[in-house]
Amino acid sequence: MSFLARRRHKKLAAMPGVRAVRRPVTPDSGERFDLHYVRTGPAGGAPLVIIPGGPGMASISAYQGIRKRAAAGGHGVIMVEHRGVGMSRCVDSGADLPPEALTIAAVVDDIAAVLDDAGVDTADIYGASYGTYLAAGLGVRHPNRVRTMVLDSPLLNRDDFEVVRSEARALLWHDDTDLAAKMRGLTGAGVLVPEDLTVAAVVYGIGGPDLL
């Protein structure tokens, strides 16, 4: 982890409601890492667990506005920084989590572990796009933790996820359109890096080409 990344990590960790729970790197490993999550709003009752699209986009920093609006409406919210992403990307040494640690089953079990750490028996689960895959997985592996569930733009299997990724790449990079040409131009000029395409796809999904 670089100096700048470490400094940003410490800043986010100091935000109200941010906590870390120790999780195994792999089921058979004795090594553990800090999985971060944030809980905001009223503490009583069943919170809303929001699982946004992705994968690869952090939750703690990017969705502060949504959590503030939810808190203003009297809703408690939990969002997990999933393993391999953002504040939950590294093992204690600062190295990235190994590929074998990044499985759907592990991510789903992480969500249940967060509910344990937060003292929550059941929660209302909201998943969007890729987040619906994780939400459904939680319902399968830990059905007793789910009070209600909303699946927004659901992915039903891994093939659906590949279709979405392929369409996003075509739309934002490969197509002969003004939007794709701008994305290629900004990347070539060093304004964007390839990883920014993940964020661009999320922005496009929310507000279309005008917002992007």
Model-derived features with residue positions:
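Catalytic nucleophile-loop/oxyanion-hole region of alpha/beta-hydrolase
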Residues: 92-106, 163, 167-168
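Conserved acidic catalytic loop of the alpha/beta-hydrolase fold
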Residues: 105-123
